[in-house]
């Protein structure tokens, strides 16, 4: 490692050295956000109750397949680099201890992810804390935010993803909404939160004043569908499910590939994703498929008309080749393609 690389690595590891975070959050968005600070040199103390532990502690997979409050992979992944403090905040003496901790330890950031009622009932909300510590940056993130007619509704990433519109767009047009994998909004919101908190730190450096950051996970997730929302506002277009297709790319789908060895060892079928995004990519693919006659379909509008024929030709061509082979071949030809990989594929992926 050269001196520049070493300097950059040290800078990254110590980026938030001296920044203190008192973390009351649980499950996804809050813990992921505070982990950014912990991993980059900040000191994070996580407050958690044994009587009502983070529900993520009960989520599989567990170490050695044995369930336990300290054995969840998810719980560990999103809370490494932090210190833990067990405390039952339903008790006044615990809340008094928290206030003493804030007075003496002087955290820069307080993070919480409860519905508005909870921290208010404990008198640990922003209004209560900022009276004594106006420099505090107080980060709140629950599903619906601190205000509005549904602010008391609790929920997880799957619910926020559904409310934000992702489920209406994911799946096949003739089937029920499928939704994206997992608690989708849990992974969309932390970068937004991280940027907002950094901006608040910069503001405090200039003014000496903290502020309250209210990140509704529902609202944050909708930003990733901004083009669809703006299109509706513009001309009333309502987008819906189009399976594996893409409005601006044809062909764009997942095709079955050949891989007998994969089936023999119980890894299931082999699939390849292909996405032609430009007319020049289509020309290259048409030659590979032996569809020289289709070269005249140089625009996406032309290819839409013959989509079923094009898909059939791709399916036939892929049926005699493995997914990895197809991916490498098409990538070398300048055509976006990727093998559909399972966990076992990822484990053995030379790039990873």
Which positions does each model-derived feature cover?
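N-terminal helix-loop segment corresponding to the beta1-alpha1 unit
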Residues: 1-206
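Conserved PLP-binding catalytic core of the aspartate aminotransferase-like
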Residues: 339-352
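Short Gly/Pro-enriched turn/cap motifs at secondary-structure boundaries
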Residues: 75, 239-247, 253-254, 274
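Nucleotide donor/acceptor-binding cores
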Residues: 19, 211, 270
